[in-house]
Amino acid sequence: MYKQGIFTIEENRPLTASVYRMVLEGDTRYITAPGQFINIALEGKFLRRPISVCDYDSRTVTIIYKVVGQGTAQMAKMQPGETLDVLTGLGNGYTMEPVHHALLIGGGVGVPPLYNLCKCLRAAGQQVTVILGFNTADEVFYAEEFAALGAEVRITTVDGSVGTKGFVTDAFPADYDYFYTCGPLPMLRAVYDRSATSGQFSFEERMGCGFGACMGCSCKTKYGNKRICKDGPVLVKEEIVW
């Protein structure tokens, strides 16, 4: 179930040159699982902006977004105390599997939804390895935050300026029991091909409504068409059709 509400900005600050962290205060009761997203209405924009939930508690929700267009540029200029019209409780989120060693793989702005998942997995006593993939060292964010949760953090950069040179698939551990991933489509496909176990994929798609009515984000699976906004954004490996 989703809920519309007015949220107040408590924090809005840059993590890198183009990536920002925003903390919103409001009714978070409808956010119930890691990997869900919110949909933000912006003044003068017809469509809401879907942004994954990085973390949440009983009072606030934290999002991390990249400035890529007019809408997110508008968000980056907003100040604490300003308000936003937000839909919460969107998407299915990740389902935690009872395994010993979980592998989390995030690329770019696919990193944020894995943070709350990592927190939940660590609270359940699971060993967690996190692979964070970026283009350069200047783009890296949240590595210390994942490490503070007790996860082993591996960083990859395309240019080799920090961590392993290459892609997230170049940093896989020898053994793990299950994986969760979020990132751009080419990365997800590479993870699918490289992975040796079952896992869950969170897809990033353009969408109109955010709650399954417009069918603008429909995708094909082995079990029929699914809407990324409502039936996803998380799909299990066994149902994905590339």
Regions from the language model: what does each represent?
Residues 1-82:
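Ferredoxin-reductase
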Residues 70-206:
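FNR/FR-type flavoprotein reductase catalytic core
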